[in-house]
């Protein structure tokens, strides 16, 4: 049985820091927020037509990962509640959690009991567990061998807590406390607004594996899907997408610096919203996850601390603004202000995101992952890695376009509107006097008076000894280090190794005359 929370470290030629993915993404959204089973079915049809973007094993029976994010269907779960003999209340007055437990019954019972205790300790009412009806025969043998026990839980919203983000924030604290106390259990989702169904499937297996997705009573206005192609990553149930807020195609190539920076901030971090709960949810980033899971951790943290999801995405994955002379001064001030607080999470990557109310898509500023979308006359937005994944009559197409680097496509299902990128960003850029704040508080390094003292240097013999000890070669110094020192530019040199094999060298390699002077 797979341990869903275990960190897999370097082994042989494998190192998790070099993992990359190339995946298929898609979404169907009813812009007016009208829920239907048709949206669920259409989203599943999209992912089934992204088979060429989904990885599979040599036998062709186990996939790298497929999943779907939906709104919680009150009609469906009210029926489930009757079967469980519990009362859920009205829509969004309860949370639904999806759990991947160990198959071992004793370990599963321990984890369930622990979660119930944590829930009650955090002031919430635990209602019931539900074993999710699945068909193990729908998946390959390798997926069955590491398949978790899949359960759902139901939690009642306290009367004093508001619907939406306030209740989800309480559920977030419960989940984080449980995750840090539990070993071997993974929580794909725990929310009052969204739910995630996923696993190590082939694209056609998702619909067949989860009976919930076949039920005509399961209705949603939002369906986001993902098919995973792990180019050099070990597939697992945990690493299938969607995550709790996002799914993505590509990779985050700045992930090490991003996660290190988030960790460093934890020493001084505070929140007027989380208050004393802040210590319960740290660390922000679960470093055993994939790059997209870590990005999801960061976005989730910002949202739970009061930031709108579109705003969190805007400052995490900014458009190319620094050398763009065509953007307004207000927008430039906005990006510069947040750039002092958060480093960009750069891809190449295409991101789909949702909190159950809004659905958005964005390309990072590299713009190297394709995403195309339709807006239809009957009020739907259809987006995918490529066109043709869902049949749509030409006369029903109102807008046909593609995502552009740094630009955001956003649908607000509560207001029932498609939000223009320029209008959205102009609104956020105008909410605070960012320019005044920068003028009053920003300090540039070039303005600091730094003593221009000569840096001590090693004598020739000592420098050569140190260079040998730390593996410096002549090419390192000539082609990389010296140009960096002279120009301040990032290293771009690259060349093959033309040194003879060690067994053919007359003297040890380190003693050969290739060292800088």
Residue ranges of model-derived segments:
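Conserved short alpha-helical segments that host acidic/polar catalytic motifs at enzyme active sites
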Residues: 1-517
